[in-house]
Amino acid sequence: MGKRLSENLSSLYIGAANKLKPRRSRRKIIAYVESYDDISFWRTLLSEYEDETRYFEVMLPSKTTLAKGKKSVLMNELGPQLGQNMIACVDSDYDYLLQGATHTSRYIINNKYVFHTYAYAIENYQCYAEALHEVCVMATLNDHPLIDFVAFMRMYSQIAYPLF
């Protein structure tokens, strides 16, 4: 048993706290993410799975340290404490492609409480050709399309592909 409260924070602890609520209350599931930028992405994604029985609270593993990244979410204190009431949400980086070549990739692939992007990072979801116009609108607050991003990226890919 850990000496500090943070060492005892686990999926079982969150589950016990959920049991103290009224019977018809929604079950809270804590979702730990890698960085501040990831909170919005995972919040949007997980909100689609909320209903009258459960909701997600998306947060960083620590409010006191500036440690970021997959290691702070998985390998430090949280890894063994994940469960049905506490999950980790991380960028796949190359771990999904490596399919178990490293300790981290084995852990991500084999742990059903670790959710990961199938692309390298969340930025890959946000910056694909069909979404680039929306990204520009959000950045400039101007909805006037000047560039056909889909055609541009198609042409760019056809030029760049033979180089690799």
Regions found by a protein language model. Name each.
Residues 1-164:
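Acidic, divalent-metal-binding catalytic cores of TOPRIM
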